[in-house]
Amino acid sequence: MIKGIQITQAANDNLLNSFWLLDSEKGEARCLAAKAEFVEDQIVAVSELGQIEYRELPVDVAPTIKVEGGQHLNVNVLRRETLEDAVNNPEKYPQLTIRVSGYAVRFNSLTPEQQRDVITRTFTQSL
């Protein structure tokens, strides 16, 4: 179980009023804020804190979700003719924005090679 604490008394003055997350299952403490000696996100064994007194703080721990091997899909709703016309007449499409690898990008800002690649990948005859 993880609990948040503020150290109120300690033999080490650098620990006074510092904030930590204590993981009782692992016997570890993660520094959230300290005057000196410890840095943010540093993990130490609870025993390294020495003799301390503390007050507990409310902590809302959100569950960590790990997704491995997922898939990614970019959706561009347009016609092939529109992109081909934008390659030949970029001045007609200054605001044409497409999705590439999760990012929105102006089609005209792509190199000619990248534009051809987008057209090839977006419009296929079969899967």
UniProtKB/Swiss-Prot annotation:
Name used for this protein in its record: Autonomous glycyl radical cofactor
Annotated GO MF terms: formate C-acetyltransferase activity
Lineage: Bacteria, Pseudomonadati, Pseudomonadota, Gammaproteobacteria, Pasteurellales
Short name of any one Pfam family annotated for the protein: Gly_radical
Keywords assigned by UniProt, alphabetized: Organic radical
Organism encoding this protein: Histophilus somni (strain 2336)
An annotated GO cellular component: cytosol
InterPro entries given in the database record: Auton_GlycylRad_Cofactor, Form_AcTrfase_GR_CS, Gly_radical, Glycyl_radical_cofactor_GrcA
Function summary: Acts as a radical domain for damaged PFL and possibly other radical proteins.
Domain of life, per lineage: Bacteria
NCBIfam families in the cross-refs: spare_glycyl
Positions of the Glycine radical domain: 5-127
Positions where Glycine radical occurs in the chain: G102
